[in-house]
């Protein structure tokens, strides 16, 4: 019994929004059971557009609900401030990291 209780306390639920192809509202679903949201654009030659504003709105929802947020990658076609960036695969992760928008609340939960 104590093992089962301890194991349940360690389970983390993540929501993966990748590829993020449109603006979404996860606010109604973010709770104590959801501890992380991961978002990113699509890779590959047929990749569809991901917009930075969608990423930021998802991040804001996480901020308001104290849920960890990880911007994993921009994807191949990324729109920021109205400009379309065509990014080679090797830059998807580093460009997302440079945005500096990840959130980490786990120690507070």
Name the predicted role of every residue range.
Residues 21, 25-109:
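Auxiliary Fe-S-binding modules of radical SAM enzymes
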Residues 5, 15-26:
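Canonical radical SAM enzyme core domain
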Residues 1-11:
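Single conserved hydrophobic/aromatic residue that forms the stacking wall/gate
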Residues 12-14, 35-36:
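Conserved active-site beta-strand-loop modules that form the wall/rim of enzyme catalytic pockets
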